């Protein structure tokens, strides 16, 4: 069984985010790897479970009253057959629990992470363009794909 709940276990959030492989994928070259950054992100954290085992976290950060940025962090050991189901569970949690003014979710994914781009498409996000040369990865400025999903488009 897959479920999602609000996370107040910041130690687990930091464990996921500070993992070397995860950090390399989600941070740009200029961001100092410091666990206190998680406390400063100003977002709502969700914790994902598969068969009651913690299996990832999600950050939701309002960029306006109508839009939230979402990032799903699934540790490498938990990726695979349940990844898409985790994504759908997260989206359904947002649809069921978000404030009434939230109408859309956005995310930006570096173009080098084809697996994450496929994941975003697989759970319903639509490509809305590019944020050109917007993140420094491995010493090179690269593009990010901009994805969006209206709350009304979330499939239950």
For each of these PLM feature ranges, what is it?
Residues 105-121, 134-135:
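Conserved beta-strand-loop-alpha-helix junction that forms the acyl-donor binding cleft
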Residues 1-30:
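Short amphipathic alpha-helix that is part of the acyltransferase structural core
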Residues 80-96, 118:
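Conserved acetyl-CoA-binding loop-helix of GNAT-fold acetyltransferases
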Residues 53-56, 115, 141:
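Glycine-rich acetyl-CoA-binding "A-motif" of GNAT/NAT acetyltransferases
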Residues 35-49, 56:
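A short helix-loop-beta-strand connector motif used in the catalytic cores of GNAT acetyltransferases and
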Residues 108, 126-142:
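Conserved catalytic-core motifs of GNAT/GCN5-like acyltransferases
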Residues 61, 65-77, 108:
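Conserved acetyl-CoA binding element of GNAT-fold acetyltransferases
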Residues 47, 53-61, 68-69:
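Conserved beta-strand in the GNAT
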């Amino acid at each position: 069984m897959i479920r999602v709940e609000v996370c107040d276990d910041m130690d687990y959030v930091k464990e996921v985010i500070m993992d070397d492989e995860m950090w390399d994928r989600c941070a740009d070259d200029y961001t100092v790897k410091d666990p206190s950054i998680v406390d400063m992100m100003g977002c709502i954290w969700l914790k994902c479970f598969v068969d009651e085992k913690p299996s990832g976290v999600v950050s939701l950060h309002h960029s306006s009253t109508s839009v939230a940025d979402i990032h799903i962090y699934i540790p490498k050991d938990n990726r695979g057959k349940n990844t898409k189901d985790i994504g759908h569970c997260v989206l359904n949690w947002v649809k069921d629990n978000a404030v009434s003014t939230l109408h859309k979710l956005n995310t930006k994914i570096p173009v080098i992470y084809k697996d994450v781009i496929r994941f975003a498409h697989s759970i319903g996000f639509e490509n809305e363009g590019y944020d050109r040369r917007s993140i420094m990865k491995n010493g090179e400025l690269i593009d990010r794909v901009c994805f969006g999903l209206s709350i009304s488009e979330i499939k239950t």
